[in-house]
C-alpha cells in the first residue's frame, strides 16, 4: 500500500473526541507536570512525540526542530500531515479539532498508529492551550494548509489553503510561543533540546533529526543507522571492554495467548566493560522508564537463565549449588532496552514504570534466543562474561558478610566514625535537612548557625572515595561514605529503601573553589551510583554560598557571582569606600553570616540536582571520574568554554 493511499485512509473521521479543553489553562500542572523549566520543555516534547509517532508508524523519515529568538520554537516532520477534512462531530476541520479539543487525535484509532508514546492527541491541544501564539502548516493532498491560534487556542480564522505542493509532499509544521502569563519565565535550553533529540535518534534508527538555533546559526544533525548499537558504543566510549562488540537482539513477539494478537517489538543492545558500576536504561515507545518495569524484568530473566544454562552446560560452576543471580549480571554492564507496544500501560502520570505483562515475556523471549546463540558462537567471550558475573557474586557475598559482622559489632563501628553527626530535634523527615559540610571549621560554624530543630550537620573530615573507580567493597570501607550511609538511614545499592530516608533535603555545602567542586563531584558520583533514587526523587541539593561580601559603610550585601557583584557595585553611590571580600571557603564566614547567606530557608539559594537523561549522566560520570585519561581530557577541552568562577 503506497503513501498516497495511506494518507486517504487517515482522514477526519479517524479523529475521536473524548472531552473538552477547559481545564488546561486553569490547572496546567495536571497536564505537563510543572509550569517551570521541565514543563516548558514538556510542551516541545509533546509536539516532537507526535512527529516521532509518525516515524514509528513508517511515514516520517525526518524531523526538524528550530529555536527562534524570544522562545519561539518550531517542529516540522515529513509524515502524512494532519487530516484536513471536516470532522463529523465538531463540524470543524480535523486540524482545528486536534488542536483545540483535549483528547482529540488519531492515536485512539488503532488503525493509524500501532504504537505511540501515549495519547498524544492530548499533547497538541495542551500545547496550544498554553501558548500565546500557535501556528500550524499542513502539506497534504497537494495543498498547503494554514491556521493560526492566539491566547490559549483561540482560532484567528478557520483552516485555509495558502498554496500548492506536490502530491507526494506531505507533513506537519507547528510553531508556537509559550504563554508566559501561565508559564514561568524560563527559556528553552538548546543543549537540553540537543541531548533529548539525540536520544530520540538513537532509539529510532535511521530517523534524521535536525536541531537548529536560528539566532546563533548552530545546526546539529542526528541520524544513527545502528540505533541502539550506536547508543551503547557511545556510553562505553573510553571504557575497557570485556566484550569487544555490542550484543544485539531484535524481534517481534506475537503470541495470541499473551498479546491478544498484537505485536510487541523488542530491541536490546548490551556490552560488558571492566567497571564496577553499570548503566542499564530502558524505554517503552521512546519514553524513558526510569523506574524500570516488566520489560526490564524480562531482560534480567533472560540474562540469568541463559548465563546459568551456559555455565552449567560448560561446567563453569565450581559447585552444583552455585547459581548466578540478577544482582551478579549487572556489574560492568551497559544496556539499552527498548520496546514498542500497541497499548502501553504505565504506572502513574509520569510514565516511569511499564506494567504490561506481555512486555516481560516478549523481552525475555527475544533476548534469550539471540543471547544463547551469541554465547554458543563466541565461547571465549561467554567465559569472560560468566567469570565477570561470578567475581561480582563473590564480592557481593563478602560485602554481605561484612555488613552482618558490622551490625553485630564485630566490624566497623559507625557510631565512632569521624565526622560526627549533629542531628536536629524534629522527627518529621519531610522537614528535616542534612547539611553535608566540607571541613571542620565550616562544620563548626554550621553547627552554631543552624536551626537546630530541622537542620542536622555532618562534617566531612577525611577523603571521600571515588565511587566510579573503586569496587563496592572499597566504597563501603570508606569512613566518610559509611558515615553518610548511617546518617541517611536508607541502606545502599540493592538494600536501598527510600521510605527509610531520615531527611528530605540532603544539602551538599562545600567551598566555592576547585577542591570544593571536587568534593561535590565525588559525593554526587556516590549518590548517582549507589543511591540514585535520592536524586531521582529530588532530595539532593547543592548549597550556593556567596562568592563576595560587599561592604559600603554600614551597608553589607552578598553577591553569588561576578555579574551580581557588578550590579551591586553599579548602584553604589560612593564607590571609593567599598570593601570587597572574596570568600575562598565557608570557614571564612561566622555562624551568623553562614546562616544568613546559605542556610536560612527563607533567603538561601540552592540548586536541586536532577537527572534529565540517565544515559547522558552516566556517560559524564564515567568520563570525568573513571580510569581512562584521554576521554576526560577530551571532555574538558570540549566543555572548558562553559566553565565559570574558576580559581587559578
UniProtKB/Swiss-Prot annotation:
<dbReference type="InterPro" id="IPR011557">
    <property type="entry name" value="GyrB"/>
</dbReference>
<dbReference type="InterPro" id="IPR020568">
    <property type="entry name" value="Ribosomal_Su5_D2-typ_SF"/>
</dbReference>
<dbReference type="Pfam" id="PF01751">
    <property type="entry name" value="Toprim"/>
</dbReference>
<dbReference type="GO" id="GO:0005694">
    <property type="term" value="C:chromosome"/>
</dbReference>
<dbReference type="InterPro" id="IPR001241">
    <property type="entry name" value="Topo_IIA"/>
</dbReference>
<dbReference type="InterPro" id="IPR000565">
    <property type="entry name" value="Topo_IIA_B"/>
</dbReference>
<keyword id="KW-0799">Topoisomerase</keyword>
<keyword id="KW-0238">DNA-binding</keyword>
<keyword id="KW-0067">ATP-binding</keyword>
<dbReference type="Pfam" id="PF00986">
    <property type="entry name" value="DNA_gyraseB_C"/>
</dbReference>
<dbReference type="InterPro" id="IPR013759">
    <property type="entry name" value="Topo_IIA_B_C"/>
</dbReference>
<feature type="binding site">
    <location>
        <position position="438"/>
    </location>
    <ligand>
        <name>Mg(2+) 1</name>
    </ligand>
</feature>
<feature type="binding site">
    <location>
        <position position="511"/>
    </location>
    <ligand>
        <name>Mg(2+) 2</name>
    </ligand>
</feature>
<keyword id="KW-0479">Metal-binding</keyword>
<keyword id="KW-0547">Nucleotide-binding</keyword>
<protein>
    <recommendedName>
        <fullName>DNA gyrase subunit B</fullName>
        <ecNumber>5.6.2.2</ecNumber>
    </recommendedName>
</protein>
<dbReference type="InterPro" id="IPR018522">
    <property type="entry name" value="TopoIIA_CS"/>
</dbReference>
<dbReference type="Pfam" id="PF02518">
    <property type="entry name" value="HATPase_c"/>
</dbReference>
<dbReference type="GO" id="GO:0046872">
    <property type="term" value="F:metal ion binding"/>
</dbReference>
<dbReference type="GO" id="GO:0006261">
    <property type="term" value="P:DNA-templated DNA replication"/>
</dbReference>
<dbReference type="InterPro" id="IPR014721">
    <property type="entry name" value="Ribsml_uS5_D2-typ_fold_subgr"/>
</dbReference>
<dbReference type="GO" id="GO:0034335">
    <property type="term" value="F:DNA negative supercoiling activity"/>
</dbReference>
<comment type="similarity">
    <text>Belongs to the type II topoisomerase GyrB family.</text>
</comment>
<dbReference type="InterPro" id="IPR036890">
    <property type="entry name" value="HATPase_C_sf"/>
</dbReference>
<feature type="domain" description="Toprim">
    <location>
        <begin position="432"/>
        <end position="546"/>
    </location>
</feature>
<keyword id="KW-0460">Magnesium</keyword>
<dbReference type="GO" id="GO:0005737">
    <property type="term" value="C:cytoplasm"/>
</dbReference>
<keyword id="KW-0413">Isomerase</keyword>
<dbReference type="GO" id="GO:0006265">
    <property type="term" value="P:DNA topological change"/>
</dbReference>
<feature type="site" description="Interaction with DNA">
    <location>
        <position position="463"/>
    </location>
</feature>
<dbReference type="InterPro" id="IPR013506">
    <property type="entry name" value="Topo_IIA_bsu_dom2"/>
</dbReference>
<dbReference type="GO" id="GO:0003677">
    <property type="term" value="F:DNA binding"/>
</dbReference>
<dbReference type="InterPro" id="IPR006171">
    <property type="entry name" value="TOPRIM_dom"/>
</dbReference>
<keyword id="KW-0963">Cytoplasm</keyword>
<dbReference type="GO" id="GO:0005524">
    <property type="term" value="F:ATP binding"/>
</dbReference>
<dbReference type="InterPro" id="IPR002288">
    <property type="entry name" value="DNA_gyrase_B_C"/>
</dbReference>
<feature type="site" description="Interaction with DNA">
    <location>
        <position position="466"/>
    </location>
</feature>
<comment type="subunit">
    <text>Heterotetramer, composed of two GyrA and two GyrB chains. In the heterotetramer, GyrA contains the active site tyrosine that forms a transient covalent intermediate with DNA, while GyrB binds cofactors and catalyzes ATP hydrolysis.</text>
</comment>
<dbReference type="InterPro" id="IPR013760">
    <property type="entry name" value="Topo_IIA-like_dom_sf"/>
</dbReference>
<feature type="binding site">
    <location>
        <position position="513"/>
    </location>
    <ligand>
        <name>Mg(2+) 2</name>
    </ligand>
</feature>
<comment type="function">
    <text>A type II topoisomerase that negatively supercoils closed circular double-stranded (ds) DNA in an ATP-dependent manner to modulate DNA topology and maintain chromosomes in an underwound state. Negative supercoiling favors strand separation, and DNA replication, transcription, recombination and repair, all of which involve strand separation. Also able to catalyze the interconversion of other topological isomers of dsDNA rings, including catenanes and knotted rings. Type II topoisomerases break and join 2 DNA strands simultaneously in an ATP-dependent manner.</text>
</comment>
<feature type="binding site">
    <location>
        <position position="511"/>
    </location>
    <ligand>
        <name>Mg(2+) 1</name>
    </ligand>
</feature>
